[in-house]
UniProtKB/Swiss-Prot annotation:
Sequence positions bearing N6-succinyllysine: 253
Positions of ANK repeats: 518-551, 552-585
InterPro entries per record: Ankyrin_rpt (IPR002110), Ankyrin_rpt-contain_sf (IPR036770), Beta-lactam/transpept-like (IPR012338), Glutaminase (IPR015868), Glutaminase_EF-hand (IPR041541)
One cellular-component annotation, GO: mitochondrion
Region (Disordered): 1-28, 46-67
Family according to the record: Belongs to the glutaminase family.
Role description: Plays an important role in the regulation of glutamine catabolism. Promotes mitochondrial respiration and increases ATP generation in cells by catalyzing the synthesis of glutamate and alpha-ketoglutarate. Increases cellular anti-oxidant function via NADH and glutathione production. May play a role in preventing tumor proliferation.
GO molecular function: glutaminase activity
Protein's UniProt keywords contain Hydrolase: yes
UniProt KW Mitochondrion keyword: yes
Listed name of the protein: Glutaminase liver isoform, mitochondrial
Modification N6-acetyllysine occurs at: 279, 284, 329
SMART domains: ANK
Length: 602
């Protein structure tokens, strides 16, 4: 049977008819009955025990080879067009941003460049018909379909970001904390700066506040440098020179653990030693370039800069770090042959690398995504390196506040004297916050408040119960209409003439031929009510079967005739002919293929 089932198989590979629901006979009007029939493929997904896991995704090439690409493109067009023959490009980009995707996303470069070229070459005034739309989206159809089906890690992205914005505004009112003054260049930072950016593991983006202003990574670079070292050298080798335990001391103490090595990579001594391990056979410039290339990949090639003023300021006033360096040298903590001054120089350089909240959030999302950059798809860090890094961030990342942060927030994070906080929600998203005023423990005053309120509202804490935590929101769950895909919702949309709802159902891979316990479909209901737009959508976009009989033996055409909806009658009669022809052609093709297969076996 030619219908939306082929599309559903390609998108969901799940779903069943389940329990029976109820709609009345057309002679009584298609009234809402008592029962419901759940779409089990979607309902079962809600009983998950893990926050989010990526299922194997079909590539655009696979979709094209299976003949599904044109159907996906058509359905996407109908969903966005909302009954219009052409789509304004700005309407497409607005709908795209509502899913969390940005037009600047590298994965959509081909799609957006084609749209721009179409506008320049055609006289359509920025309008795309179905054919032009197909050409533009064909190379990104799988990603776009997932976005509009709300199949990303945070399905209701606009609702989620609305909550984030409110938390941001609450933290904005805070006035406590002081800008760090012990590094002269940082003392000039504007205390009113306040920005938050997030990037999910699916590449959904949101920014609020001062998110395009460059700032130095400072200590936020420590977990990144450690991750690079473990990825290139391995865990065992790196931890010959640095430990894994919280120190219980200030981050810049001259102190070693019982084994005579720095306590962990998040204190200055540990970070300096880790810096010394990178490309030991290379000169200073090559070492810095090597790390910078890694950081660029983690940030998806977004903004990355270098503050020479901060670097020089660090070198001129870094007496404590020089003391730590000489202490480490005296205790023989560096690998044999390492130049201690070169290691300190690299450490100062890396602390002076600049990012914005936006590029920093992508770096955090790369950690959240197991080392794979979400906006480029490039595998940057090993899974082992990411696991180790997040573990150390969780236990040692927030200076002397690490224990309390792990207790109250329960997420891996790293703070910096620049006022930055790099926050990771594993398997969900990464965030970068910036607010220069620091509390007495050296963490961003606004940033700490933001993180605490975020976890008090959402069940992101590592030990929040994902099944039974009723007081907290779970943005990973699909809400409302998407979650409750029932035959009642489908038939009620057809009854009320809500084509927009039907488009969303179809794009979400709902079976558009579902029946209630009277065996009535959405096409039966729409035909009985005379909703010509609904009937058109069901037969043109969804290709539903018009010959389904209800328990009284009526097909949708019979209902249209009974209630004297002449336009619907004409439309269904024409569709009957084309549907029967296509069915015949499909059967002939299937028989021919079976015959060829049989002959090849003989």
């Amino acid at each position: 049977m030619r219908s939306m089932r082929a599309l559903q198989n390609a998108l969901s590979r799940a779903g069943s008819h389940g329990q029976r629901g109820g709609w009345g006979h057309p002679s009584r009007g298609p009234l809402l009955g008592g029962g419901v029939r759940y779409y089990f493929g979607e309902a079962a997904a809600q009983g998950r025990g893990t926050p989010h896991s990526h299922q194997p995704q079909h590539s655009d090439h696979d979709a094209s080879n299976s003949g599904m690409l044109p159907r996906l493109g058509d359905l996407l067009f109908y969903t966005i067009a909302e009954g219009q023959e052409r789509i304004p490009i700005h309407k497409f980009t607005t709908a795209l941003k509502a899913t969390g995707l940005q037009t600047s996303d590298p994965r959509l470069q081909d799609c957006m460049s084609k749209m721009q070229r179409m506008v320049q070459e055609s006289s359509s005034g920025g309008l795309l018909d179905r054919e032009l739309f197909q050409k533009c989206v064909s190379s990104n159809i799988v990603l776009l379909t997932q976005a509009f089906r709300k199949k990303f890690v945070i399905p209701d992205f606009e609702e989620f970001t609305g909550h984030v914005d409110r938390i941001f505004e609450d933290a904005k009112e805070l006035t406590g904390g002081k800008v760090a003054a012990y590094i002269p260049h940082l003392a000039k930072s504007n205390p009113d700066l306040w920005g938050v950016s997030l990037c999910t593991v699916d590449g959904q983006r949101h920014s609020v506040g001062h998110t395009k202003i460059p700032f130095c990574l400072q200590s936020c670079v420590k977990p990144l440098t450690y991750a690079i070292s473990v990825s290139t050298l391995g865990t065992d080798y790196v931890h010959k020179f640095v430990g894994k335990e919280p120190s219980g001391l200030r981050y810049n103490k001259l102190s070693l653990n019982e084994e005579g090595i720095p306590h962990n990579p998040m204190v200055n001594a540990g970070a300096i030693v880790v810096s010394s391990l990178i490309k030991m056979d290379c000169n200073k410039a090559e070492k810095f370039d090597f790390v910078l290339q890694y950081l660029n990949k983690m940030a998806g090639n977004e903004f990355m800069g270098f503050s020479n003023a901060t670097f020089q300021s660090e070198k001129e006033t870094g007496d404590r770090n020089y003391a730590i360096g000489y202490y480490l040298k005296e205790k023989k903590c560096f690998p044999k042959g390492v130049d201690m001054m070169a290691a300190l120089d690299l450490y100062f350089q890396l602390c002076s690398v600049e990012v914005t909240c936006e590029s920093g959030s992508v770096m955090a999302a790369t950690l959240a995504n197991g080392g794979i950059c979400p906006i480029t798809g490039e595998s940057v860090l090993s899974a082992e390196a990411v696991r180790n890094t997040l573990s150390l961030m969780h236990s040692c990342g927030m200076y002397d506040f690490s224990g309390q942060f792990a207790f109250h927030v329960g997420l891996p994070a790293k703070s910096a004297v620049s006022g930055a906080i790099l926050l990771v929600v594993p398997n969900v998203m990464g965030m970068m916050c910036l607010s220069p005023p620091l509390d007495k423990l050296g963490n961003s005053h606004r940033g700490i408040s933001f993180c605490q309120k975020l976890v008090s509202l959402f069940n992101f804490h590592n030990y929040d119960n994902l099944r039974h935590c009723a007081r907290k929101l779970d943005p990973r769950r699909e809400g409302g209409e998407v979650r409750n895909k029932t035959v009642v919702n489908l038939l009620f949309a057809a009854y009320s003439g809500d084509v927009s709802a039907l488009r969303r159902f179809a794009l979400s891979a709902v079976d558009m031929e579902q029946k209630d316990y009277d065996s009535r479909t959405a096409l039966h209901v729409a035909a009985a009510e005379g909703h010509i737009d609904v009937v058109k959508f069901l037969i043109e976009a969804c290709k539903v079967n018009p010959f389904v009989k209800d328990r009284w033996g009526n097909i949708p055409l019979d209902d249209a005739v009974q209630f004297n909806h002449l336009e619907v009658v004409k439309l269904l009669q024409d569709y009957h002919d084309s549907y029967m022809l296509s069915e015949t052609q499909a059967e002939v093709a299937a028989e021919t293929l079976s015959k060829e297969n049989l002959e090849s076996m003989v």
